[in-house]
Amino acid sequence: TTSGVSGITSSTGLPSGVTASYSANTLTISGTPTATGTFNYTINLTGCSDDATGTITVFAPPGGISSNLKLWLKADAGTSSTSDAADVNTWTDQSTNSYSASGYSAGGKYYENGINFNPTITFDGANDYYTISGGIIGSGVNIDDAFVYYVGTFDTDNTQMAVFHESCSDAANGGENSYWKFQREADAEIFYNKGRANSSYSLVRDDWGGASSQPYLWTAVAASSTSTPQGTNKYITRNDNLILANNGTSNAEGNGGDFHIGANNTGGHDFDGNISELIIYEGVSSASDEDKIQSYLALKYGISMGTTSSTFSYLSSDGTTIWTGNATFQNNIAGIGRDDNSGLHQKQSKSVNYGAILTISTQAIAADNDANTTSLDDGEFLMWGNNNASTSSYADLPTGGGYTGRLQKEWLIDMTGTVADVHVEFDLSDLHLNLAGDEASDFYLLTDADGDFTSGATATVATSFSSNKVTFDDFNFSDGQYFTLATKQSAPGGIASGLHLWYNASTQSHNTGTTQATDGQDVDNWHDQSGNNFDANSNQGDASWDEDG
């Protein structure tokens, strides 16, 4: 409140979407910011010799959900170094609490392209954890509800590895030893405890069901009521698939113990893997809010949520459905898109699932998402998922147009807004098919309105074919469109019609896995080149490969 001022002469430094006004001796700054960051403003008041100055900090929270955000560590912000493979000595919380996590010794290492072209912090399991001194609960404060969202990997089997740990007390039970912790156990269980140590009231744990080094989105919940998205006090999900849910509550009162990331309170249970993002809310998330937070993380990191039997619809921060759960195509979901209210701008994506062959980008694929200099508009999304058909299966197509067949695997597009002129790339390295195509003109992107492709499909010839990668530049998809890759199928004498089985000693006769056998090596499996998947595997003893025949 001021006096003797008649109005505002000028203002500078306010974030876009925020304005200053003066009326009835009161200066008001208001609006909805459309940009994030720290803004130092100056307002010159008419009739006053002193300017009004101040600082406004605007941040875009995960999924647009800022209420009760307790901790937000992400590898693409707040790290003391952004040089590839460099030590990260400090990691700063992106919530308004601005906790600073200090690395023990050198801390973890920063990698620019960790998960789906986004950065990650890598821990080697040897005392490279972080500490927030004094913890984040607050001494003498009870944390009733704690919702944890974590994206990363566990890279070692049969080892206890803590994502985070803070010692606390159970004041209601005489200060009994308690802790707050999320980790993977040595017996391949996932473990979340908030309260009394290993009590059924505070603990939820079960077989984790995952694979080492595979990125997942974990959600771990311990709440004082059952008004949670799962209807229970406690639960853990992996990629929205329920691991375990149960009831029971326990007090977790802060006692000034440090909060550790990548180890327990004594430095044990060292973490070996990657942490790309760790988010904690102190409060109960609604089902809609949880979906928004998970959708933000899943799109950013190329994580496929749900299953064909339990589908998941991805939401933007304003509640718009950007991927509608699909009982056929809820596999290997990925997407590009921009959501300013989440601080999300994903410009190139590939599913992190094993065997994914498709990448889509706003331009030729860059080294990482940050290096991609193009831009989408806020609210634009292009999502895709596939039917989970084998990449070793081939479907015949009517002759003509330079191709004889297509992959059995096909994809579905779900578009919000208009995302145009995208770069589409198929990596054929893992295909167990003997394709005859050896130049761009041999490959076609087939699009279709119904996913049948036998009639009414549109074929677009590839832009390039190099290093086993087929690319299509400046391609425009339509919402609800199906697509797949078509080419010539190699066949004996060029006759593919009616081909039922074809073993060729010179192609895909493997000693182990997908490694081509060399002279004198045993052949463990021999892949059928017909596209019908009649692969032959050794049951007892092995035939050997002779390069001279």
Regions found by a protein language model. Name each.
Residues 60-100, 277-367, 422-439, 472-542:
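GGW-centered surface loops in extracellular recognition modules
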